[in-house]
A protein has these predicted regions:
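N-terminal non-catalytic accessory region
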Residues: 1-215, 222
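Glycine-rich, aromatic-lined ligand/substrate-binding cores of catalytic
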Residues: 220-256
Length: 256
C-alpha cells in the first residue's frame, strides 16, 4: 500500500508517473501535480555533496508501528487500524515497543524536494512524536553521528522545530544551524484539545474508530503521551493558569 512506502520509493513513483491514480488518491490532485513536478525538478538538481539538512515533521507527522521483514505494521496512520480500534496500542508505556517508521509525506516531502532543488542534501527524519522532546533530540544527535555528517542544518516544523532547538542547545558544536517553522516554543493549545478529546484530528479519528469515541481516545491514548504534556502552553498564554499542574484541569476522567 502506498501509505506504507518510504519517501525515496514515493519520489521514484512521482518521477516516473507510475501508480498515478493511487498517488492522486493519497495526495490529492493538487498535491500530486505539485509533488510530481518537484520530484522531476529535484532529480535534475545537483544536491549530492551539498550541505546536509535534516527535515523534521511536526506533531503526529511520523508513521508509528512495528517493522516487519516484508511489510511494516503501521498503526499511525492506517485507516483500517483506526477503524479496528487499534489506536489504543499507541498508549504509553504499554506501546513502548512501537517506533517511528517514516514520515507522513505530503508536507515534509514538499519541503525536502524544495531543499534538494536549492542544492541541499535534504533528508527526512522521522521520530516517535509520542516521546519526550529531550529523548527525541538525543536520538536525532545519535543519527547524525551514525550518518557521519559534519555540521548539518536542521529544519523542523511544529514539534520538530522544538526537537531541533533542543538538539542544537545540547550540542552546538555538531549542528550548524536550526530553522524553526511554526515551532511552539511557548507551548500550544493543541495538546490541551487532544487530551480533552476535542482536537479536530482526534474527532476525525473517532469518527472512523468503530470501538472508541473521542473521549476514549483522549483518555486511553493522548493523555499518556509525554510529548503532549511537555508541549502544554506556558502560563503567559493561559492568563496565568498553570496547565502543568493537574489540579488546574477539570476533575474528570480526562484529567492528566
Amino acid at each position: 500500500p502506498l501509505h506504507r512506502l518510504h519517501d525515496e520509493e514515493v519520489v521514484r513513483l512521482l518521477e516516473s508517473g507510475q501508480r498515478r491514480e493511487e498517488l492522486t488518491g493519497l495526495l490529492g490532485a493538487d498535491g500530486y501535480r505539485e509533488l510530481s513536478s518537484l520530484a522531476r525538478e529535484a532529480a535534475k538538481a545537483r544536491h549530492r555533496g551539498g550541505q546536509v539538512v535534516y527535515v523534521l515533521p511536526g506533531l503526529m507527522g511520523s508513521r508509528i508501528g512495528t517493522r516487519g521483514r516484508l511489510l511494516d505494521d503501521v498503526i499511525w496512520l492506517d485507516p483500517i487500524e483506526v477503524a479496528a480500534g487499534h489506536l489504543t496500542r499507541l498508549a504509553l508505556p504499554r506501546g513502548s515497543r512501537l517506533a517511528a517508521l517514516g514520515v507522513m509525506l505530503l508536507n515534509a516531502l514538499k519541503l525536502k524536494l524544495t531543499l534538494q532543488i536549492a542544492g541541499f542534501d535534504a533528508r527526512l527524519h522521522a521520530y516517535d512524536w509520542r516521546r519526550s522532546v529531550e529523548r527525541l533530540a538525543d536520538e536525532l544527535l545519535a543519527r547524525i553521528e551514525s550518518d557521519g555528517v559534519q555540521s548539518p542544518m536542521l529544519v523542523g516544523h511544529s514539534m520538530g522545530g522544538v526537537v531541533a532547538r533542543v538538539a542544537l542547545a545540547a550540542d552546538r558544536g555538531r549542528i550548524a544551524r536550526a530553522v524553526q517553522l511554526g515551532a511552539p516554543n511557548s507551548g500550544s493549545f493543541a495538546p490541551v484539545l487532544a487530551m480533552r478529546g476535542v482536537y479536530p484530528t482526534v474527532r476525525k479519528l473517532a469518527a472512523l474508530d468503530l470501538r472508541h469515541d473521542a473521549e476514549d481516545l483522549a483518555r486511553i491514548v493522548f493523555r499518556t503521551l509525554p510529548s503532549l504534556h511537555e508541549l502544554l502552553p506556558d502560563a503567559d498564554l493561559t492568563d496565568g493558569a498553570n496547565l502543568f499542574d493537574s489540579s488546574e484541569w477539570p476533575d474528570d476522567a480526562l484529567r492528566p
